[in-house]
Amino acid sequence: MQLSNEDYYNFFIRCCTNMIDRYDFRFFKFDGISAQASAIGPDEGTRGEENAEAIISIERAVRQKRPDIFLNTTVGTWASPFWFHFTDAVWRQEGDYGEAGDQGTDRERWITYRDRLVYQNFIQRSPVCPINTLMTHGFILSRWGAVSKNMDYDGIVREMRCAFACGSGMVELYNDYKLMDEIKDNQGNAGALWKDLAECIKWQQEQADVLPDAHWVGGNPWDGKKANVYGWAAWNGKKSVLTLRNPSASAQ
């Protein structure tokens, strides 16, 4: 079904408002408003334009019903600051999971893949689009599916910290509880990842006054030949935070 279909559009709005009224919904993820894995605009033709306009109209209606709703609009959005008149987060583009470069473990290459897309689609192509508004699939720890199978403790902690330090207001945790319980830290303590996760959450909450102004620093995580140091910086006149990542397997 397409949101450009009037009957489906009206049904969709009724479902959203009903979930707010009956179940106190405070978050909606709207996915698949386009067939494009990496979008720079709506799908071609009138239908594509109507689908994009329809999701904007739906979000206006939902926001009017509940002003504090968090709206995450994913596949079908593109790197434009104008989306944030209506939604709270947009998709970084391309696949849910992938790997980029030839450096480090599959987990390190996954982080590089994710952040390379942010650099390509937002930093280079749309530099005025804020990067604290992105859905990136922040932290993934699972034994299932096409995801990183490296379970090195230090690598997992690095991925976790990057997910929070990038400043995104949309932090996702795809973490397997059993793995969180089982994986041991460098002292042999199982379950330490829960403490690490709590520390990341606490750190982000303590930086809530500065992270909304997060900016990219450094280079391209993977430029096709070389893995380059990069990171995120934020400041507000009273304090600042700086996070750097070296995606290379050697010191830089």
State where each predicted segment sits.
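The substrate-binding groove and active-site-proximal loops of carbohydrate-active enzymes
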Residues: M1-I13, S34, S38-A52, G145-N150
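Active-site-adjacent "subsite" loops/lids of carbohydrate-active enzymes
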Residues: M1-Y23, Q93-G95, A100, T105-R109, ...
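Short acidic catalytic loops
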Residues: F12-D43, L71
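Active-site-proximal substrate-binding groove within the catalytic cores of carbohydrate-active enzymes
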Residues: I56-Q252
